[in-house]
Amino acid sequence: MDLKGLLHEENELPSIEKRKIDENAVEHDKVERKRTKSVAVPKIEMNFLNKPIVPDTTKVISNFLTHYLITEPVEHVEIEAKLGTLIDLETQNRFEFPVMNETILNPEFNLRTRFESDMTASEHKYLNEFLNQAFRDSQKPGRLPFAYKHTKQVDLFYETEDNSRDKIRVSKNQSDNQVLACVKKRRVADLFLYCPNDAFDIRISISDELPVSMPSGNQQPSLTRLKDRVGYVHQEIKIDLTKTTQNDPVYDTTERHELEVEFGNIADLRDRAQKAKDGMEAPLFRRVQLFMDNVRILRREHS
């Protein structure tokens, strides 16, 4: 017997076993990859049409804006939302409706309501601090930054020649008395949103701010209003916190605290509304959703 040959064959056994193990490992790896592929999570579609569905609230507000931007266009339009309280004219208390979430009121119901856009000084201060923190956070890398401005101005209101309800407003810079604007502001339409889960309701207003000539030098203002305003701008949506002091005898106090959110680029909004009229609604819906999301963040923050 050739021992050398036997020893040679015996020494080959480990390498043969190693090859078998390696081959088994490769097969096992193939099976695992197949199994991973077979149990992959399927893609989730938005719905059975795989199309985005616009919330009713966004659609109603978009239609409301489109009417005054395109159908019956207001030339010098201002569109803003204010936080406040819907008051029942019969009870003089906040309205109570049998609904559980944010609800748009039919404009025909507006005659039964009054909207008070005032809030307490502590609520105003809290929202100021909240927005200041949001401003700081937006300056971090990867964010779209806020713009910020603090202004103080005086508004002088003058009666018109026809003594109409719409007055001429002259706005001046408090520091140097420079005239910033002279307009006749006319309220065109309101849309009220009742928000039972939060401290504030919402009023969306359409106004016409028509530039006019300065009142004559001997005409005295019927009302003077001082404005201390902190303004923030993010993605062309303006957020203003304003403290006003006025001599209007209608209110019990001369000091009021308000928060408003306003579309900063009306030309762009009008273009989006025209596209919506022509059948391409998505750009307008996205802008309205952005606007309302900003309003909702502020409305819910102190509730």
From Swiss-Prot:
UniProt cross-references to CDD domains, sorted A to Z: CYTH-like_mRNA_RTPase
Subcellular localization, as worded in the UniProt entry: Nucleus
Gene3D superfamilies given in the database record: mRNA triphosphatase Cet1-like
EC number: 3.6.1.74
Pfam families per record: mRNA_triPase
InterPro entries to which the protein is assigned, alphabetical: Cet1/Ctl1, CYTH-like_dom_sf, mRNA_triPase_Cet1, mRNA_triPase_Cet1_sf
Assigned keywords, A-Z: Hydrolase, mRNA capping, mRNA processing, Nucleus
Required cofactor(s): Mg(2+)
A cellular-component GO term for this protein: nucleus
GO biological process, one term: 7-methylguanosine mRNA capping
Single Gene Ontology MF annotation: RNA polymerase II C-terminal domain binding
Catalytic reaction(s) noted: a 5'-end triphospho-ribonucleoside in mRNA + H2O = a 5'-end diphospho-ribonucleoside in mRNA + phosphate + H(+)
Quaternary organization: Heterodimer. The mRNA-capping enzyme is composed of two separate chains alpha and beta, respectively a mRNA guanylyltransferase and an mRNA 5'-triphosphate monophosphatase.
Family: Belongs to the fungal TPase family.
Cited function: First step of mRNA capping. Converts the 5'-triphosphate end of a nascent mRNA chain into a diphosphate end.
Protein name: mRNA-capping enzyme subunit beta
Organism: Schizosaccharomyces pombe (strain 972 / ATCC 24843)
